[in-house]
A protein has these predicted regions:
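N-terminal secretory signal peptides that target proteins for export/translocation
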Residues: 1-10
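Domain-level signature for soluble enzymes in the chorismate/prephenate branch of the shikimate pathway
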Residues: 14, 18-316
Length: 316
């Protein structure tokens, strides 16, 4: 009787072990099926309706306008005082995306913001907006151009309106502020008829200002390129553009350009920022067209550089 009970218990134990083994195999099979297969591409995935987007504020900046273009006026947009704060909000999970200016037709690379992108090693680029920029001189209602003694704007706004200022307000004091919209806000709140701001026409509505002069930018084809950033893994699926950072010595740059030519890759933009270790060593922020992820992988074999992939994305 005792022997029979012992045999029965041992049999049950074996059966239980077999059942656990089967369940484990099934679980592993499910996990394997859910993994991305080797060589599979990662697409850009954006839920515009539920997006929370951090941007350089206050309300009325061109960056806010770029947010509306990319996200089709869906989601919610949260203004921050600086681009660094806007990107940090993304990194800390307070927002799901951040939109930052990257380059302007007249002002060139927006250096501070390029540095911010380089410093945040976990972010990816999931989209781009090329926005036509029309600069305007805004002032309190009833103000005349002859009254203006001080002009506020972001340094890009100042650069873009420099020729007009030299011709029409040569004696005005020009003061740099954190954004074009911040300049408009200061004029509205300061209530000084001697002050004006270079900003978007939208700021006239937001801050109840008059447009004293429209379209004062130096170039009628003035545009700014904005990047849409995310904490998602960098997308590898084929798209209009691809961006990456190459880190290395300037002497090796011709070799990288030759490698791009061999891969039939079109260079869209290249910005260099010092590595701050040795003279001649740089971060190169590179955006290109006609470049698949496979082509990028070949480029990343170029000697003399280390690489950081930012993503494949389309342009709005």
């Amino acid at each position: 009787m005792y022997t029979t009970r012992f045999f029965s218990t041992r049999t049950k134990a074996r059966a239980s072990a077999l059942l656990l083994a089967v369940l484990l195999c099934l679980s592993l099979a499910r996990c394997a099926n859910s993994q991305t297969a080797p060589g599979a591409t990662i697409p850009v995935q954006i839920d515009k309706a539920s997006a929370t987007v951090s941007y350089l504020g206050p309300e009325g900046t061109y960056t806010q306008e770029a947010c509306g273009v990319f996200f089709e006026k869906q989601g919610s947009y949260l203004p921050y005082t600086t681009v660094q704060e806007a990107v940090q909000a993304l990194v800390e999970g307070q927002t799901s995306y951040a939109v930052i200016p990257q380059e302007n037709t007249i002002g060139g690379a927006v250096i501070d913001y390029v540095d911010t992108l380089i410093a945040q090693t976990e972010v990816s680029v999931v989209g781009e907006v090329e926005l036509p920029i029309t600069q305007n001189l805004l002032a309190l209602p009833g103000t005349t151009l002859a009254e203006i003694k001080t002009v506020y704007s972001h340094k890009q706004g100042i650069a873009q309106g420099k020729d007009w200022l030299v011709e029409h307000l040569p004696d005005a004091e020009v003061i740099e502020v954190s954004s074009t919209a911040e300049g408009a806000r200061m004029v509205a709140e300061g209530k000084d008829p001697a002050c004006a701001a270079i900003a978007a026409a939208a700021c006239a509505d937001v801050y109840q200002l008059d447009i004293l002069a429209a379209g004062i930018q130096n170039n009628e084809n003035n545009k700014t390129r904005f990047y849409v950033l995310s904490m998602q893994p960098a997308a590898t699926a084929e798209a209009e553009r691809l961006a990456f950072i190459a880190i290395g010595d300037a002497k090796a740059l011709p070799e990288l350009m030759t490698a791009m030519e061999k891969q039939d890759v079109t260079l869209i933009t290249l910005h260099d920022r010092p590595l701050k270790t040795e003279l001649g060593e740089y971060y190169y922020l590179i955006e290109c067209a006609g470049c698949s992820y496979e082509s990028y992988q070949e480029l990343s074999k170029t000697e003399g550089f280390s690489f950081r992939f930012l993503g494949c994305f389309d342009v709005e």
